[in-house]
Each structure stands twice: as structure tokens, then as C-alpha cells.
Regions:
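Conserved N-terminal entry element of GNAT/NAT acetyltransferase domains
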Residues: 1-4, 111
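Conserved acetyl-CoA-binding loop-helix of GNAT-fold acetyltransferases
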Residues: 42, 48-61
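Conserved acetyl-CoA binding element of GNAT-fold acetyltransferases
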Residues: 32-44
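Short, low-complexity Ser/Thr-rich regulatory SLiMs
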Residues: 27-30, 44, 98
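Conserved beta-hairpin
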Residues: 5-23
Length: 111
């Protein structure tokens, strides 16, 4: 685990998973039974290999095993890949959860 991941866990209770393909980070919103995806990043040369989908599968499996009812994420509208990212999430049955200035929040039920 990197120092940055340790810092985020200690100070913000954010769990980080890193492997040779990239990383993702999650935060538990216990009072809402929701697991929030804080960040997900895949190495550029691997982005056509469905690594993000594999990460989502791991996140949803963890959420189901730990009693979460929903998984959420936010997309920063100023990210140069925002349109593509939103389209992919919405195409995979994520629903609009909220908007917050520069971000759009998405939610998906855990089944």
C-alpha cells in the first residue's frame, strides 16, 4: 500500500485497491448502506481491456458480501473523459443520484 493510500485510510477511512492495471478507492457510507467509489483509474494502455468492468465487479461483490444496498460514484464534469465515462455508466444501468456543481453522482442497486 502506498503512503498516500495509508494516509487516505487513516484520515478519511477510504480503502484503496492497487494492482498492475490501475487502482480504485471506496468509502463506506454506513448510514445509507452505500459504498461510494471515490476513484477509479486504469493505465491508459489497458483501457480497452475492460479492467474498469473487472474493478466494478470486485466492488459490487464486496458490497453484496458486506450488506450494502447501493454503490455510488461521481463523475467530475471537467474530466476530459467525462462524456465517455457518463455514457458508459448510464449504459450499464446506473441512475442519476445527484448533481453537485462540478460533479454528477450516479447510483446502482446491489443485486
Amino acid at each position: 500500500m502506498s503512503y498516500y493510500a495509508e494516509y487516505r485510510k487513516e484520515c478519511f477511512d477510504i480503502d484503496t485497491f492497487e494492482d498492475e492495471n490501475g487502482l480504485f478507492a471506496t468509502k463506506s457510507i454506513k448510514e445509507e448502506k452505500r459504498l461510494h467509489i471515490e476513484e477509479m483509474w486504469v493505465k491508459p494502455e489497458l483501457r480497452n481491456k475492460k479492467i474498469g468492468q473487472q474493478y466494478q465487479s470486485k466492488i459490487f461483490k464486496y458490497a453484496k458480501e458486506n450488506g450494502y444496498e447501493r454503490v455510488s460514484c461521481t463523475v467530475n464534469l471537467y474530466n476530459k473523459h467525462a462524456n465517455e465515462t457518463l455514457a458508459k455508466f448510464l449504459n450499464n444501468n446506473w441512475k442519476l443520484g445527484w448533481t453537485n456543481g462540478d460533479y454528477i453522482g450516479l447510483i446502482k442497486e446491489v443485486v
